[in-house]
Regions:
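Acidic, glycine- and Ser/Thr-rich low-complexity intrinsically disordered tracts
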Residues: 169, 190, 314-325, 459-600
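Right-handed parallel beta-helix/beta-spiral solenoid domain characteristic of secreted/periplasmic
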Residues: 163-177, 196, 208-260, 531-534
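Right-handed parallel beta-helix
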Residues: 214, 220-223, 245-256, 270-281, ...
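Recognizes extended acidic, P/S/T-rich segments that occur
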Residues: 83-131, 143
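Acidic Gly/Asp/Thr-rich repetitive segments characteristic of extracellular carbohydrate-active
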Residues: 163-205, 519, 584-587
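Extracellular fibronectin type III
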Residues: 141-164
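Solvent-exposed loop/turn segments flanking beta-strands in beta-repeat/beta-sandwich domains
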Residues: 73-86
């Protein structure tokens, strides 16, 4: 949530800066300086170029994706790689997936809580079919030796879309008798059918369903079953879960509470489903900050907060009155096809801080896709405090201070793929607090200010095929302290004839570049980058700062004469099915129908 204001300086100025700090100490101001917590996280192992494969982890699968981690020792020169291929079990032909990301002890959140990431590879196989068994082939190579002779082949199955048990009882619930009276009768596999009416909370459910036989709370098809608490003040919650699992909430209305559904520590909740519900007049919609929460399915909901406006963003109280629409932590969650609006953050990873020591309890393998996210006083999407294989793809974001945030991220990858982002006032990409492991592919982002303006502290980031459009200032003003960060095949808008790029390299040297060619020759970045303008779109202009827009006010599909057609690079699974000589830039391939956003 916090924004770290960064000032990029050359290392040549460190002596001067040190002298100023010494004067402050002499003047007695040192006691006012914030203490940085000690470095925590992974230990640095043996320093050697040869690789030693260690633990291989298959993370809890989601409905469309599989995620993996391969811990290693060595490879200190970072020249090892893991190629990935997959196929449905029983088929013969392998298909390529994206290679695994090399994670190598990057230190995230350096100013507020330094955390050293591990020595590993991490990555996902994307856009798969639900409830389907796959074989995944991982080929580890290292010129310095130590890699297995044969590829590792593992089997993994995507999760099924959750459904009620067919053979359970139906228990009728009425507002007069109360919801708890029906719940006390329920056993795994039952459906509690709520009749229209007002059900006054709070509710704490103390028994669970099972994965095969969940307990389902289902609202009526005619009329509303409304669950409410005591208002947005205090800490009123409608539903609280703590070690209670496999409960489904469907076709219900939640309202008038601080939090609609909360999974508390230490137990959290496994297998929670919230589907086709309406949630409104709340500070938080759905919330868990527990590492033991797993395998949620949050789909097709309308979630509306209490923020009266999204602009201007308050400088000190920007996380109130409405906080976050969907806020999750743990493993295996799916948040899809929701409409979330009028919160400070629309959809987010919970601000957990550094992960616990148990790597199986890290925040991994979480999906956000096909959501409609708007009116965000802070971020439409926030991956802050995630660890590996968090995926944000095919979402529509608009009317927000910030588009996509990763401040910090603990290792990566965090995938940002084919998102439409428009009407941003500050940062399309918020990469503050030294995040590590950002993969941004085929996004279209349109900001009123500079197109790409995160502080020069993001690490191990890789950007391809993006349309990065701004309205004023530099097209690109940023930098990275890791020399292995890469940017190529992206298009930028020149907003100012005298300013194009300001870049701070891994040595701390800041330079200005007036052309992409001089930028490439100096840095090796954007060899195939290009300039573009809003005329590549069917209908769009630079967003005006603070002006509220609606999706029908603009159309970010590209037209067939646009210079960004066929200007991209082929990325396994991401650009599959492109129609021309090469993939197009941005979130929409020419001629392909845009995805559906929000409830179906």
């Amino acid at each position: 949530m916090r924004t770290l204001k960064e000032t990029s300086v050359s290392f040549k100025n460190i002596v001067t800066l040190s002298a100023v700090l010494a004067l402050l100490v002499t003047a007695g101001f040192a006691r006012e300086r914030r203490e940085v917590p000690p470095l925590v996280g992974s230990e640095v192992g043996p320093q050697m170029d040869e690789i030693v494969p260690k633990r291989f982890i298959v993370d809890p699968p989601t409905i469309e994706n599989l995620g993996f981690r391969w811990v290693i020792e060595g490879d200190s020169n970072r020249n090892a790689s893991v190629a990935v291929a997959f196929r449905k079990k029983g088929q013969r032909r392998w298909k390529d997936a994206l290679p695994m990301l090399r994670v190598h002890h990057e230190v995230s959140n350096q100013a507020y809580g330094p955390y050293r990431t591990g020595n590993l590879f991490a990555g996902s196989v994307l856009f798969l079919e639900p409830a389907t068994a796959y074989e995944v082939r991982l080929t580890l190579r290292d010129p310095d030796g130590g890699a297995p002779v044969k590829p590792k082949i593992i089997e993994a199955t995507t999760r099924a879309i959750p459904k009620a048990f067919d053979g359970g009882r139906t228990i009728e619930a009425t507002a007069e008798k109360g919801l708890m009276a029906a719940f006390e009768q329920a056993r795994p596999g039952d459906i509690i059918q709520l009749h229209p009416g007002l059900y006054k909370g709070p509710f704490e459910f103390n028994k669970s369903g099972t994965a095969e036989r969940p307990i389902v709370f289902r609202g009526p098809t005619d009329g509303e079953a409304v669950l409410e608490a005591d208002g947005v003040g205090g800490r009123s919650r409608i539903v609280t879960l703590n070690g209670t699992h496999h409960l489904f909430f469907e076709r219900l209305t939640f309202r008038n509470a601080h939090t609609a559904v909360y999974a508390a520590k230490p137990g959290g909740s496994d297998g929670l489903v919230i589907r086709r519900c309406k949630i409104h007049d709340v500070v938080y919609g759905i919330n868990t900050g527990c590492e033991n929460s797993r395998n949620w399915f949050i789909a097709d909901n309308d979630i509306i907060g209490i923020n009266p406006t999204w602009y201007p963003r308050p400088s000190k109280t920007y996380m109130s009155p409405g906080h976050t629409g969907v806020n999750v932590y743990g493993q295996g969650h799916v948040i899809c096809y929701n409409r979330i609006t009028r919160f400070s953050d629309s959809a987010a990873i919970y601000n957990f801080g550094p992960p616990v020591d148990d790597v199986l309890k890290h925040c991994v393998n979480i999906d956000f896709y096909n959501n409609d996210l708007s009116w965000a006083q802070d971020d439409t999407f926030e991956a802050d405090y995630g660890c590996h294989n968090v995926r944000f793809y095919r979402n529509r974001c608009y009317n927000a201070h910030t588009g996509m945030s990763t401040q910090p991220f603990y290792g990566g990858p965090v995938y940002l793929i084919r998102n439409e982002v428009y009407g941003i006032t500050s940062l399309s990409y918020k990469l503050n607090n030294y995040p590590a492991g950002i993969l941004a592919y085929n996004n279209t982002t349109c900001c009123a200010g500079s197109g790409f303006r995160p502080p020069p502290i993001w690490q191990n980031g890789h950007f391809r095929n993006n349309l990065i459009m701004g309205g004023s200032g530099h097209a690109l003003i940023s930098g990275s302290p890791t020399p292995y960060s890469t940017m190529d095949y992206n298009a930028y808008r020149r907003n100012d004839p005298d300013r194009l790029i300001q870049w701070t390299d891994h040595r701390g040297n800041r330079s200005q570049y007036r052309t992409l060619d001089t930028f490439f020759k100096a840095t090796g970045l954007e060899e195939h980058g290009m300039l573009a303008d809003y005329d590549v779109f069917m209908k769009a202009g630079p967003p005006e700062q603070g002006k509220t827009c609606q999706p029908n006010d603009y159309d970010l599909r590209i037209h067939k004469e646009a210079k960004v057609v066929d200007a991209g690079v082929d990325l396994a699974q991401v650009t599959e099915g492109f129609s021309g000589k090469a993939p197009d830039l941005g979130c929409y391939e020419l001629g392909q129908k845009p995805p559906h956003y929000g409830p179906r």
